From Swiss-Prot:
GO MF annotations in UniProt: proton-transporting ATP synthase activity, rotational mechanism; proton-transporting ATPase activity, rotational mechanism
Membrane disposition: Single-pass membrane protein
Gene designation per UniProt: atpF
Chain segments annotated as transmembrane: 7-27
CDD domains for the chain: ATP-synt_Fo_b
Keywords, comma-separated and alphabetical: ATP synthesis, Cell inner membrane, Cell membrane, CF(0), Hydrogen ion transport, Ion transport, Membrane, Transmembrane, Transmembrane helix, Transport
Presence of the UniProt keyword Cell inner membrane in the record: yes
Subunit architecture: F-type ATPases have 2 components, F(1) - the catalytic core - and F(0) - the membrane proton channel. F(1) has five subunits: alpha(3), beta(3), gamma(1), delta(1), epsilon(1). F(0) has three main subunits: a(1), b(2) and c(10-14). The alpha and beta chains form an alternating ring which encloses part of the gamma chain. F(1) is attached to F(0) by a central stalk formed by the gamma and epsilon chains, while a peripheral stalk is formed by the delta and b chains.
GO cellular component terms, A-Z: plasma membrane; proton-transporting ATP synthase complex
Protein name: ATP synthase subunit b
Origin species: Verminephrobacter eiseniae (strain EF01-2)
Cellular localization per UniProt: Cell inner membrane
NCBIfam families: ATP_synt_b, PRK05759.1-2
Length: 156
């Protein structure tokens, strides 16, 4: 193989091509690749930030939901306690009112019983007086007195 001027000219043309490519073609390509790499890195960083923000937001939401659940449970428990207290108070009032009514009814029944006894005593006294009066008006005879006593018993 012989080295001649064509090889030198081709080497010079190649070096000119390399220099031209390094000066005018390679910088825009490298710049485009760097910009693309930067955009990808920025996108990944934004995705990481969004992911961490989402995680923080989820934690805040979970915390607020937990607080809301606790507040709701506390309010329900308080309402249930109030309702139970109202029910107990109503039961106590109803029992007290019932006891008053029973006591009043007993007192009224006792009073009526006393009045009935007094009326019965008065009637017995009247009948006894009538019976004694009739016995004293008639002659003393066992048969007659027995009849009067039977009649007196039926009247009582």
């Amino acid at each position: 193989m012989s080295i001649n001027a064509t090889l030198f000219v081709q080497a010079i043309v190649f070096l000119i091509l390399v220099w031209f490519t390094m000066q005018f073609v390679w910088p825009p390509i490298a710049k485009a690749l760097d910009e693309r790499a930067q955009k990808i890195a920025d996108g990944l960083a934004a995705a990481d930030r969004a992911k961490s923000e989402l995680s923080a937001a989820n934690q805040r939401v979970e915390k607020e939901l937990s607080q809301a659940r606790n507040e709701t449970a506390a309010r329900l428990a308080d309402a249930e306690r109030r309702a139970q207290a109202i029910i107990e108070e109503a039961k106590a009032r109803a029992t007290e009112e019932g006891n008053k009514l029973v006591a009043a009814a007993r007192a009224e029944a006792e009073q009526q019983m006393v009045q009935a006894r007094e009326a019965l005593r008065a009637q017995v006294a009247v009948l006894a007086v009538k019976g004694a009066e009739q016995i004293l008006r008639k002659e003393v005879d066992a048969g007659v007195h027995a009849g009067l006593l039977r009649r007196l018993q039926t009247e009582l």
